[in-house]
Every structure is written in C-alpha cells, then in structure tokens.
C-alpha cells in the first residue's frame, strides 16, 4: 500500500516519556515493555503515532538527551529485542513510531568524544567543535542554553569544545562528511 505524501497531516500523536509512563518490572522506572503493555489502551484512544522521548544508552545527565550509544537501548528501558517488539506491535496496530533522535550533540561519554578530546591529531579529533583559547579565555562570549559559557576547556587538547546545552553534551561537527555519514547511518538503522 502506497503511503500518502502528506501522511503527517493526519497524525494523532501521543507522546510517551518512557521513564515515567509504565513500569513493567517494579523497579520504579518506566520501560519499553511497560509501553508495550499499554498499546491496546493507546490504540483505543485513536492514536496513529507514538512519539518517544530518548531511549538510547545515556549517562542521563539530561534525561536521555545526552546519548552515549546510538545503537543501544538504555538498560533501564529494556533491550533491542524489546524495542523491536514495540515497533512490530505498533505497526500491527497502524501506529507509527516517532523518536527523539538527538543528532546535534552526543554525551561527553560517547566513544567519539572520549577519543576526540585526547589530542588534536587523532582520527576523531575534528568530530566535535573545538576552538583555541582567545587571550587565555573562551573563544567568544556565546552562552549555553542551560546558562554559563557554551565553551568548556579540555587541558589534554589545550582547547575549548562547544556545547549549546549542558557541558556534558558536546556539539558534533556536522559540517564534516565523516560525521554526517555515521550519523545518517544511525538514523537509517532504525
């Protein structure tokens, strides 16, 4: 069946914040099996799209928006098998799955950043936005959305990295093809 070009106009969306939606195992944290257990109820509401806040591996500095593993589900939310089951059951009910997939930045615990910050000449050195100090201080006066400077100094490199949000969320240098391609591949894998 061919999908209408403007299908998005007909969506009735229900947003789920997984952490607080439905706990399936009694640990006090909502999870993917919990969401799965409520699909019949959500379907009865008449929704045709489920919007999920981040469920990827994250140290959770910013409620999952600081992703350290784009191809892994956060342990407290379940497994990739749980994810696959949720998607399959949603699709059986005619429910599209929309995800918050953060591609502007990663966690400072992501393997790319851990390598990038070690030196100026490693294979991942330009994966993030780095700048030299200006007169011994931040490169400019840009502010973070969360307050304070948008720049954080890393002694190993002798440079500042840019973070629009938390200092735990360094911005990716998306102008580089070798960054956009792996990021695009992560998008396609879902």
What are these regions (language model features)?
Residues 2-175:
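Acidic/aromatic-lined carbohydrate-recognition and catalytic surfaces
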